[in-house]
Amino acid sequence: MPSGRKWLRVSSVVFDASAILALALGEHGSDMVRAARPDAIVSAVNYLEVVSKLLRVGLDEAEVLSFLGEAFPRVIPLDRSQADVAARLHAGSRELGLSYADCACLALAAERGLPVLTGDRQWTRIDVPVEVRLFR
């Protein structure tokens, strides 16, 4: 490798909040999440959801932020294009009960052409050009 050049890891999967929570809380399926983690990216909206949920269950804020910062360094901001896609998904999927965060995750995956890793079986019923992988 040439010296002085920074090599970037290519992402291969987008994590939904359920995947991050499974890893953080040691839930069923966390082994599959752990294996995919080095190549994962996370929407900032899902990151917000995870931090909020972990703090609500009483975990220490400094520990939560440290763990997430080390485990998931690639948090992708929500841009206008993703927000537009997420809004259309949210409006068209009321019967599935998708949250804004769910739709932001799917929009990021669609934009990047990546599969999404989730624990939510409802996602397999969504009409969106994204491969949905279940970890449990």
Label each PLM-derived region with a short phrase.
Residues F72-S93:
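Acidic catalytic patch
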Residues M1-V42, L54-S66:
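Short, well-structured N-terminal submotif of metal-dependent ribonuclease cores
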Residues V13, D39-I41, A71-V75, P115:
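Short loop->beta-strand "edge-of-pocket" segments that line small-molecule binding or catalytic clefts
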Residues L21, V51, T124:
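Nucleotide phosphate-binding site architecture
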Residues M1-S12, L106, A110-R136:
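Acidic, PIN/NYN-like endoribonuclease modules and their adjacent C-terminal/linker elements
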Residues A36, A71, V128-P129:
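Short, structured coil segments at secondary-structure junctions
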Residues F15-D16, V42-A44, L98-Y100, D120, ...:
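Histidine- and aromatic-rich ligand-binding microenvironments
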